[in-house]
Amino acid sequence: MSEPIEKPVEKPGVEPVSDVKDTDPAKKDQPVLVSTTKLTKTQSETLKKLIDELPQILEETGDSSYDEIYGYRINKSGLEHVHDEIRNEIVLKFLIAEEYKFEEARTRLINTFKWRKKFQPLSAAYSETFDKELDDLGVITKYDGTNENLHVVTWNLYGNLKSPKKLFQKFGQDDKAEKEGSPFLRWRIGLMERALSLIDFTDKSNSKIAQVHDYNNVSMFRMDPGMKAATKEIIKIFGDNYPELLSTKFFINVPTIMSWVFTFFRTIGLVSEDTWKKFQVLNSGNLATWFGEKNLPKAYNGSNDSTVESLFASEAKTEAPEYAKIMIHKAALDID
């Protein structure tokens, strides 16, 4: 029932930002394009080339007017609503995902623009409403004072899934007459988009989100075929269109008998050491070490004498970015 392990991406040459000033004269004239990652000269040049190529990239999507990713305008500098720093950081994520290979990153960007125009994830996030059965499966929280990139969290509460077969019969089928994808898929993508509105792409400590997958009272041996198909589709979409946005993925209340699966994947090389570092596989629900006791209900070893459902009471308020609102309005006019 978990979203399966994504294909690992190695990130050679990426180092954390350092306070030590670079005194190399050959690097003084290099533009500082991003603040979250220290780039080599070659990496910086490749990023600049990719940014400069954006107008042509947009032309190749078939609709250059759709220039939005995660609610921000991704286009050339000087245009209204283009925030250079945010744009650069988003483009960098696509470049890192392709190991700084220009052509591959360029193709990934083209495909993401196309997918976003077709799927309309902003509508799923901010315009559409979903059945309570779906809304009860996930929630977004935001915590202050937690460790780096553990501030924004999406919770996947599979224990609230009472009847997987019935739910996926009801919400797991595509309804192409209305929107692209099934209601479940649109709900899940919408959850992700809303979570991304809470991060700061230019802040090294808050430029990614964390995910929690809670398997309490869930059988991992009997997964509904509809859920398997939906999970596979979600992983493909996330892998292609949401690169470098996950800091840590917590798998909690995992039955001991299933814990070996994660270790096995690592042993045979399906999970790189870099990707493995993002995983926390726990037999319990104790998350206090990462998110703090005061933020959590008792079920997660928190100090709050409340149930898991109390997370919904502390759900983070999300708002569409400025340019997202413009694109949502434009899409509505196009439909009319």
Swiss-Prot record:
Q: What is its main location?
A: cytoplasm
Q: Which CDD domains match?
A: SEC14 (cd00170)
Q: Which cofactor does it need?
A: heme b
**Database matches in SUPFAM superfamilies:** CRAL/TRIO domain, CRAL/TRIO N-terminal domain
UniProt biased composition (Basic and acidic residues):
1-30
**InterPro entries given in the database record:** CRAL-TRIO_dom, CRAL-TRIO_dom_sf, CRAL/TRIO_N_dom_sf, Sfh5
How does the record classify its membrane topology?
Peripheral membrane protein
Catalyzed reactions per annotation: a 1,2-diacyl-sn-glycero-3-phospho-(1D-myo-inositol)(in) = a 1,2-diacyl-sn-glycero-3-phospho-(1D-myo-inositol)(out)
Q: What is this protein called?
A: Phosphatidylinositol transfer protein SFH5
| Organism (species) | Meyerozyma guilliermondii (strain ATCC 6260 / CBS 566 / DSM 6381 / JCM 1539 / NBRC 10279 / NRRL Y-324) (Yeast)
From the broadest rank down, the organism's phylogenetic lineage runs:
Eukaryota, Fungi, Dikarya, Ascomycota, Saccharomycotina
Q: Gene name?
A: SFH5
